Amino acid sequence: MTVGYSDAISGARQIKMLGLAGTYTQILDENRPIMRGLSAPYGLSYTPGMWLNSIQVSKGISSVTAGHEAITGQINLEHRKPTDDERLFINFYLDDELRPELNLSTALPVTKDKKLSTILLLHGSLDTHLLGDMDDNGDGFMDLPKTRLGAVANRWLYTADNGAQVRWGFKYLAENRLSGQKHYKASMREEMDTDWDKGAMYGSQIKNRELNAY
């Protein structure tokens, strides 16, 4: 299994399993199909690693119970649980390109008997490009897009006396991606459409919004 960039301009990545493209690999969120359609190329970056407890990978044709996409295999993401003993987790990360990332999770019981519990997950990251637009190969295009990502998820769990469980929750994500030639700005988008014959700068601006609930 390998991960590679399928589009250098937008920063889209895909998983290759058994030599086939990522569209043949099914990604599950606790056995629920996610990352279909336009969100598939960015699916991995939409699930912060600090939100996860484990990742389960199975290769080969799987059951169609959760969908028909699992031709080469399945990747199942297991998140932190509302019943976790760790009540508060905060993680701050800063890489050598001065890209900050903040993750927070808090799990707590809502009732004294702990039958009802919840967990709140927050994530924020920002490509600052404070050291300049990365262009290591000198082709005039940014090697990485300028990305601003914010995500919040809230999960609930109710456990009855007989052991039956009811789960529900939601996740909202907002992301802006700006890429293309160095020094390209979002305000130049109209110039790229109308003045392309005059050497206007080329760039790409992508806005993704995602809301799902279960």
Where are the regions a protein language model picked out?
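Periplasmic-side early beta-strands and strand-to-turn transitions of outer-membrane beta-barrels
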Residues: 84-85, 107-204
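Short acidic/polar hinge/loop motifs at secondary-structure boundaries
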Residues: 14-16, 32-59, 152
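Extracytoplasmic beta-strand/coil segments of soluble accessory domains associated
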Residues: 1-33, 53
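Short strand-turn segments of transmembrane beta-barrel domains in outer membranes
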Residues: 54-56, 62-64, 74, 79-109, ...
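Hydrophobic, lipid-facing positions within transmembrane beta-strands of outer-membrane proteins
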Residues: 13, 71-73, 86-88, 100-104, ...
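Transmembrane beta-barrel domains of outer membrane proteins
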Residues: 18, 58, 78, 105-109, ...
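Short sequence motifs at beta-strands and strand-loop junctions characteristic
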Residues: 8-9, 67, 95-98, 144-148, ...
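Extracytoplasmic
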Residues: 12, 22-24, 39, 50-52, ...
